[in-house]
Swiss-Prot record:
<keyword id="KW-0648">Protein biosynthesis</keyword>
<keyword id="KW-0862">Zinc</keyword>
<feature type="binding site">
    <location>
        <begin position="344"/>
        <end position="346"/>
    </location>
    <ligand>
        <name>ATP</name>
    </ligand>
</feature>
<keyword id="KW-0436">Ligase</keyword>
<feature type="binding site">
    <location>
        <begin position="361"/>
        <end position="363"/>
    </location>
    <ligand>
        <name>L-serine</name>
    </ligand>
</feature>
<dbReference type="Pfam" id="PF00587">
    <property type="entry name" value="tRNA-synt_2b"/>
</dbReference>
<feature type="binding site">
    <location>
        <position position="477"/>
    </location>
    <ligand>
        <name>ATP</name>
    </ligand>
</feature>
<comment type="subunit">
    <text>Homodimer.</text>
</comment>
<dbReference type="InterPro" id="IPR004503">
    <property type="entry name" value="Ser-tRNA-ligase_2_arc"/>
</dbReference>
<feature type="binding site">
    <location>
        <position position="313"/>
    </location>
    <ligand>
        <name>L-serine</name>
    </ligand>
</feature>
<dbReference type="GO" id="GO:0006434">
    <property type="term" value="P:seryl-tRNA aminoacylation"/>
</dbReference>
<dbReference type="InterPro" id="IPR002314">
    <property type="entry name" value="aa-tRNA-synt_IIb"/>
</dbReference>
<comment type="function">
    <text>Catalyzes the attachment of serine to tRNA(Ser). Is also able to aminoacylate tRNA(Sec) with serine, to form the misacylated tRNA L-seryl-tRNA(Sec), which will be further converted into selenocysteinyl-tRNA(Sec).</text>
</comment>
<dbReference type="Pfam" id="PF18490">
    <property type="entry name" value="tRNA_bind_4"/>
</dbReference>
<keyword id="KW-0479">Metal-binding</keyword>
<dbReference type="GO" id="GO:0005524">
    <property type="term" value="F:ATP binding"/>
</dbReference>
<feature type="binding site">
    <location>
        <position position="363"/>
    </location>
    <ligand>
        <name>Zn(2+)</name>
    </ligand>
</feature>
Length: 514
């Protein structure tokens, strides 16, 4: 996608020459738009093509690709401009206005022509060969905060996706996004602050240098372990899962068999083993000592080709355990793992404590007859909902629209059996998001049919049907959903959590932090 914007930042008074000079310093700092942009994608970030001062207005022409899109870029300018000139020149920003904004999506001309006559609220849609131009005019700060632009883009892309007959929609007997159950909290939820905004000032977390990673200090760790214990007691143990220790370094061949490499190749951390040549690494060390920087290019020459990924789904070792084995569906298997981190590369999508690249989960995986697999999936979801209700956490459960294992199957493969509903997703409400009702996904309950059974050559010794399923209890997200509804005041927490946590430990005592 490409974005082209004509807009204005409107100040509280005419912008004088000295003020203009300071603002120009901000405008010429391209790093403002690079935060959250993956390495190698810098040319996709916002770029100011031209600027002009006219009375109270700073007129801007901006372009971008898909990272730090132009409408996000113009908003991102407000804070550094005010930090530079607000107090110094006694000036404020009254509004951000977008006079004209063109979002261009490219697709096959035949697909574009199918959108003829498409009407999208708040904008015009223009079709031109392989281009779909979504044109907005006269948008203010209010429209930007209501995410009108993003919703319109999503709407048009969904119309395109319908033409592809996405396998999830083909397979699912209930429309993805359908809410199948919900629960309203009995108490009044008064806390409405993003928990990420308070976690660091309170000393519960500290930013780690890696993108999408955090250092969780003792109070947060205690809350994590409390939820881990509750999920095991209230959900996992009641169904009778056996704990195992799953590897987290997964060979690429395993991901290929899972078809994960087809579905989400850009969402994993790839691991390159080093060459066992100490003398070559000595050159690397010597250069680093002399230059006082890490010689990345030399390091690349010392690494073998990618051979592994860090576990992005956590259930991968389960299918490998049964690879080309004969099983007896009369003796089904139910394993769970909570032995370490799960890793997904979110790129620019990583934000706050709820969308991270490194997170904790309790992963349940099972295998048996289709009836057994469906019953277990329903139980894993039912007990998660029961736990939320015991804690008076407001939630809803919906039919998922993105079962991870279907990403690698854009068309239905002959002979593969799929369930009527591949995925249910349970979400805890996030009250601090005002524009729309948003929730953080805390439990994902999936049935794979014969997808993995076929991929790994697993058979029943009597040639009966074998299915698999998995449910992930997102420990990190359960904690964030809980804090979003209850806040950080221990006395406001439900008794069940207080008993599990016990006395909250103190935060580290430093002079300069938090």
């Amino acid at each position: 996608m490409r974005f082209k914007l004509d807009g204005r930042i409107i100040f509280s008074k005419d912008v004088e020459e000295e003020t203009q000079k300071d603002i120009v310093e901000v405008l010429e700092n391209g790093d403002i738009f690079l935060k959250g942009v993956p390495e190698g994608k810098e040319n996709e970030a916002s770029k100011i093509e031209t600027y002009e001062f006219d009375g109270k207005d700073l007129k801007l022409k901006m372009t971008s690709g898909t990272y730090t899109r132009a409408h996000e870029g113009i908003v991102r300018l407000k804070k550094p401009i005010m930090e530079k000139v607000g107090r110094k020149h006694q000036i404020g920003i009254r509004d951000v206005a977008i006079d004209r904004y063109v979002v261009t999506i490219t697709a096959e001309p035949s697909k574009v022509s199918e959108l003829k006559g498409l009407k999208v609220p708040e904008c015009e849609v223009e079709l031109e060969g392989e281009k779909i131009n979504i044109v907005f005019e006269n948008l203010g700060d209010g429209e930007l905060k209501r995410n009108i632009i993003d919703r319109a883009i999503k709407f048009v892309k969904n119309e395109l996706d319908k033409q592809d007959k996405d396998l999830t929609f083909e397979v699912c007997k209930i429309a993805p996004g359908t809410i199948v159950s919900d629960y309203k909290a009995k108490r009044e939820i008064t806390f409405d602050t993003d928990p990420t905004e308070l976690a660091e000032p309170y000393g519960w977390v500290k930013r780690f240098p890696g993108r999408g990673q955090w250092f969780y200090t003792a109070p947060m760790a205690k809350l994590f372990r409390a939820f881990e214990s509750l999920i095991i007691e209230e959900c996992i143990d009641k169904i009778g899962f056996d704990e195992c220790l799953f590897p987290k370094l997964i060979p690429l061949d395993v991901m290929y068999k899972m078809r994960y490499l087809e579905g989400l190749p850009e969402g994993m951390y790839y691991v390159c083993p080093p060459k066992r040549e100490p003398e070559m690494f000595q050159d690397f060390v010597n250069e680093m000592m002399i230059k006082k920087e890490i010689p990345i290019e030399k390091l690349k020459t010392l690494l073998r080709d990618p051979a592994y990924v860090l576990a992005p789904a956590q259930c991968e070792p389960f299918y490998t355990f049964f690879d080309h084995e004969l099983v007896d569906v009369d003796h089904p298997s139910k394993f769970f793992d909570k032995s370490g981190w799960t890793y997904r590369w979110e790129g620019g999508g990583a934000k706050g404590l709820d969308r991270v690249n490194e997170f904790l989960r309790g992963e349940c995986v099972w295998m048996g007859t289709p009836e057994f697999v469906e019953t277990v999936r329903d139980d894993t979801l039912k007990y998660a909902e029961n736990l939320a209700e015991k804690l008076d956490l407001e939630y809803w459960t919906e039919v998922g629209d993105d079962p991870f294992y279907l990403e690698g199957r854009k068309t239905e493969a002959r002979g593969i059996e799929f369930p009527d509903v591949p995925k249910y997703e349970m979400r805890l409400w996030l009250p601090h998001i005002k524009e729309e009702r948003k929730g953080v996904a805390v439990t994902s309950a999936n049935i794979h049919g014969t997808h993995f059974v076929e991929g790994f050559g697993i058979k029943d010794y009597k040639e009966r049907k074998v299915w698999t399923g998995c449910t992930g209890y997102g420990l990190t997200r359960w904690v964030i959903g809980f804090l979003a509804q209850y806040g950080y005041n221990y006395d406001d927490w439900p008794e069940l959590i207080q008993k599990k946590v016990g006395k909250l430990p103190e935060i580290p005592k430093l002079i300069t932090w938090p």
